[in-house]
Curated annotation (Swiss-Prot):
Species, as recorded: Prochlorococcus marinus (strain MIT 9313)
Reaction(s) this enzyme catalyzes, per UniProt: Hydrolysis of proteins to small peptides in the presence of ATP and magnesium. alpha-casein is the usual test substrate. In the absence of ATP, only oligopeptides shorter than five residues are hydrolyzed (such as succinyl-Leu-Tyr-|-NHMec, and Leu-Tyr-Leu-|-Tyr-Trp, in which cleavage of the -Tyr-|-Leu- and -Tyr-|-Trp bonds also occurs)
One biological process term in Gene Ontology: protein quality control for misfolded or incompletely synthesized proteins
UniProt subcellular location: Cytoplasm
Cited PROSITE patterns: CLP_PROTEASE_SER
InterPro entries reported in the protein's UniProt record: ClpP (IPR001907), ClpP/crotonase-like_dom_sf (IPR029045), ClpP/TepA (IPR023562), ClpP_Ser_AS (IPR018215)
Record-given protein name: ATP-dependent Clp protease proteolytic subunit 3
Subunit structure comment from the entry: Fourteen ClpP subunits assemble into 2 heptameric rings which stack back to back to give a disk-like structure with a central cavity, resembling the structure of eukaryotic proteasomes.
Length: 197
């Protein structure tokens, strides 16, 4: 069930679902696995906010266990494509593709709340069918693994070899460790400068 917010004005009351109300403040919330539905919604929201005001930052709050690599890359590419900076904030858990998107925020504008957890690892996948089909899927997973590792190395400043080693298995970090690693830029315990009216 999505909470409803009632807003009063001189013209009466108006009801909004909470996510629509947050969107008015340029806040997007990823609080679920990354799927085609969640990715399409987030991409559409970013494009809408860019069209509304290309100079004002967009805030992406992330509490996600990860999900589809392809859909996550669609969000990532849109974050890099839109003119406004996208500030990212981890609330709770940013794991797998969630951590990748957290790291994809504008440099200097990536943060985590103090009790959150961040986890990186290699992409997961599986294949069935004929040997040639399994080989095609295995090659694609290896391609994606290399692509994600190279982006993480670029965005964190870590050597590619370290990223490859650390993503071989689940690699959990505290917010302070994620700052040292280069995944985020700061740990916050108070609301960033913007505020919801």
């Amino acid at each position: 069930m999505i909470p409803i917010v009632i807003e009063e004005s001189g013209r009466g009351e108006r009801a909004f679902d909470i996510y629509s109300r947050l969107l008015r403040e340029r806040i997007i919330f990823l609080g679920e696995p990354v799927t085609s539905d969640s990715a399409n919604r987030i991409v559409a929201q970013m494009l809408f906010l860019e069209a509304e005001d290309p100079e004002k930052d967009i805030y992406l709050y992330i509490n996600s266990p990860g999900g589809s690599v392809y859909d996550g890359l669609g969000i990532f590419d849109t974050m890099q494509h839109v003119k406004p900076d996208v500030q990212t904030v981890c609330v709770g858990l940013a794991a797998s593709m969630g951590a990748f998107l957290l790291c994809a925020g504008a440099m200097g504008k990536r943060s985590s709340l103090q009790h959150s957890r961040i986890m990186i690892h290699q992409p997961l996948g599986g294949a069935r069918g004929q040997a040639s089909d399994i080989r095609i899927q295995a090659d694609e997973i290896l391609f994606l693994k290399d692509r994600l590792n190279r982006v993480l190395a670029d965005r964190t400043g870590q050597p590619l070899e370290r990223i490859q080693e650390d993503t071989d298995r689940d690699f959990f970090m505290s917010p302070a460790e994620a700052v040292g690693y280069g995944l985020v830029d700061s740990v916050i315990d108070k609301r960033p400068v913007h505020s919801v009216n």
